[in-house]
From Swiss-Prot:
SUPFAM superfamilies: Mediator hinge subcomplex-like (SSF140718). Component of the Mediator complex, a coactivator involved in the regulated transcription of nearly all RNA polymerase II-dependent genes. Mediator functions as a bridge to convey information from gene-specific regulatory proteins to the basal RNA polymerase II transcription machinery. Mediator is recruited to promoters by direct interactions with regulatory proteins and serves as a scaffold for the assembly of a functional preinitiation complex with RNA polymerase II and the general transcription factors. Component of the Mediator complex. One of its GO terms (biological process) is regulation of transcription by RNA polymerase II. GO terms for cellular component: mediator complex. This is Mediator of RNA polymerase II transcription subunit 7-A. InterPro entries: Immune_Mod/Transcr_Coactivator, Med7/Med21-like, Mediatior_Med7, Mediatior_Med7_sf. Its main location: nucleus. It comes from Xenopus laevis. GO terms for molecular function: transcription coregulator activity. The gene is med7-a. Belongs to the Mediator complex subunit 7 family. The keyword GTP-binding does not apply.
């Protein structure tokens, strides 16, 4: 008889997959293709499973005797199983003390095994509810984090707008330019008003407004540089 097959409880280290999916392999179409979906059965942890099996299989399909009714209260049944396990464990200790070689020892072991199987089965029936609750909590946490991030962004935006408004309000009209010259008071020119010089026309007025805006931008940059 051959050696029993060793079954690992952990997946293969991911580096064995990563090295196959490098940028060069993907560019040259050398990366392995996704495996074909399994249609019939598969092996997991040394046991064979069918693709159409239920996530939580009934006890009868596994050849295990059912101790609780079909319609029941999970909490009550779990409490009953817990008490039964405790009583059977004490009986097991009594048997080991009085007659360790008795056949009742094996019977009591089977009873304990059946009780533990039922307890794990009832706990596993809570898994879908646990998954939904975990997903709900995770989504609530993500929602709260995004709302807090948006609120922080809004506060920073309001602070920046306030700082810019205060800086603009504190700018003098005759602020010196970076080259040492003094800028005269400039006001945005309304392009709708007629120009005094008929040779400049609308283009000259727009250029004057642009130059005035550039002067203020340069002065603002100088103030910011001094602040930092």
């Amino acid at each position: 008889m051959g050696e029993p097959q060793q079954v690992s409880a952990l997946p293969i280290p991911p580096m064995q997959y990563i090295k196959e999916y490098t940028d060069e392999n993907i560019r040259k179409s050398l990366a392995p293709k996704p495996p074909v979906p399994i249609k019939d059965s598969y092996m997991m942890f040394g046991n064979q499973f069918q693709c159409d099996d239920l996530i939580i299989r009934p006890l009868e399909t596994q050849g295990i005797e059912r101790l609780h009714p079909v319609q029941f209260d999970h909490k009550k049944e779990l409490r009953k199983l817990l008490m039964s396990i405790l009583v059977n464990f004490l009986d097991m200790l009594d048997i080991l003390i009085r007659s360790p070689g008795s056949i009742r020892r094996e019977e009591k072991l089977e009873d304990l095994k059946l009780l533990f199987v039922h307890m794990h089965h009832l706990i596993n029936e809570y898994r879908p509810h646990q998954a939904r609750e975990t997903l709900r909590v995770m989504m609530e946490v993500q929602k709260r984090q995004r709302l807090e991030t948006a609120e922080r962004f809004q506060k920073h935006l309001e602070r920046v707008v306030e700082m810019i408004q205060n800086c603009l309000a504190s700018l003098p009209d005759d602020l010196p330019l970076p080259d040492g010259t003094v800028s005269v008071k400039t006001e945005p020119m309304d392009v709708q008003e007629p120009c005094t010089d008929h040779h400049e026309g609308p283009q000259g007025a727009a250029a004057s407004v642009k130059e005035a805006t550039i002067d203020k931008d340069a002065a603002m940059c100088g103030i910011i540089d001094e602040m930092t």
